[in-house]
Amino acid sequence: MALTMLNGLLIKDSSPPMLHQISKTPQLDAFNYQSCFMQDLFAHFPEVLFIHRTYNPRGKVLYTFLVDGPRVQVEGPLARAVYFAIPTNEDARGLAQMFQVFKKFNPAWERVNTILVDPHFLLLPTLTMEFPTAEVLLSAFHICKFLQGKFYQLPLEQPVQRLLLSSLQSTMCSATAGNLRKLYTLLNNCIPSSRLPELHSHWLLNDRIWLAHRWRSRAQSSRYFQSLEIMAHILSQFFGTTPFEKQGMASVFRYMQQNSSDKASLSLAETPQDSHTPSEASAENPNTEQLVEARIQHSLNAICTGPAAQLCLGELAVVQKSMHLIGSGSEKMSIQILEDTHTVQPQPPASCSCYFNQAFHLPCRHILAMLSARQQVLQPDMLPAQWTSGCASSLDSILGSKWSASLDKHLAVTLLTEEVGRLLQHCSEEEFERRYSTLRELADNWIGPYEQVQL
């Protein structure tokens, strides 16, 4: 097959881009892309290479290479991206070809010291063969995502699930040996022994993994994970939802063009045959629906923090492509978008049964579709306070604060008190009396009957 430029994309840069494609069909057989800006960025920071993989419905995988490490001070979800590639096949030969193309255009590859990968990356021998002087490690971000997924998959009670997710988030932002050991112990206590091997909890005790991440402060860790979460969501949204690799990559490049903070000099223009899809043609004549969506976009930017707005705007982009209201009632609405059907609870704070809303507690594509259908906009009481723009400064001060033993104890007591109170409120009268008597007996035995304990 002939080597051709990617149909439908023109990347403007100071010198010709390095872009390779095999095949003229919407399904790319192989694809490698690096702009001169990306090449220059990698040349400046080659020491640590972060590899993220995104699969589409056809099973093709997009490899995104990002620079990482203490010297990299670049903001934006895709600002650290230095290479995009889709191998012909995800086997030893296909990956070897992909890495060899990368090395051909990047002489600085010899200075790569560390490569961070996800736990499902199986072709490690190929990676070590192509980068013989680099140490290959699991990335803290991918371990975090792996454990999060397991917590949602395992049949855990909600209080236990919330405790594990909260502890995981706290540990990732302060990955000291002590905190990792605490999380390891918590997993051993909360996860059934038969399912514990699935979690690979021994990763938490591998200090070499965490040395590559531990240099970050608590605030830096929070921003780092948030940025990578948004990056993964963007790639999944644009590339992972379409079986056509060409269309997926065009969407990724379009996002990078529209978000100048990610890559200011990247621009994209479409060929005539691709530039007038039905949805884009209708955009030339704004109607009521489009005006409503514009108002929703404005309300997101006005109410949410920057990262929250970016996540929700990505969800809104899906709504703009395809939305179908399949049922409506006074209490609940059923929203179907593309392949998903989920139940939306519109009363503040709005909630949805989809993973995005359950994980981030932010307005998802289904909630935004509901707002669009009702010609409404986002209201501040529809999302948690920590995601509102007014709370951004207070969050930064909390994330930047130092840990203290007294605060840790206070938080533990507060969480326990809230959980006990919740359990007492949501039980029968008979169960309440039994639980209250048990608590009364525990309190009296602990402090002594000579001192009345207020329960």
Swiss-Prot record:
GO molecular function per UniProt: zinc ion binding
GO cellular component terms given for this protein: nucleus
Keyword Metal-binding: yes
Pfam families: SWIM, ZSWIM1-3_C, ZSWIM1-3_helical, ZSWIM1-3_RNaseH-like
Gene designation per UniProt: Zswim1
ZnF start-end (SWIM-type): 333-375
Protein's organism: Mus musculus (Mouse)
PANTHER family: SWIM-TYPE DOMAIN-CONTAINING PROTEIN, ZINC FINGER SWIM DOMAIN-CONTAINING PROTEIN 1
Presence of keyword Transferase: no
Full protein name: Zinc finger SWIM domain-containing protein 1
Region Disordered, annotated ranges: 264-288
UniProt KW keywords: Metal-binding, Zinc, Zinc-finger
Domain of life of the source: Eukaryota
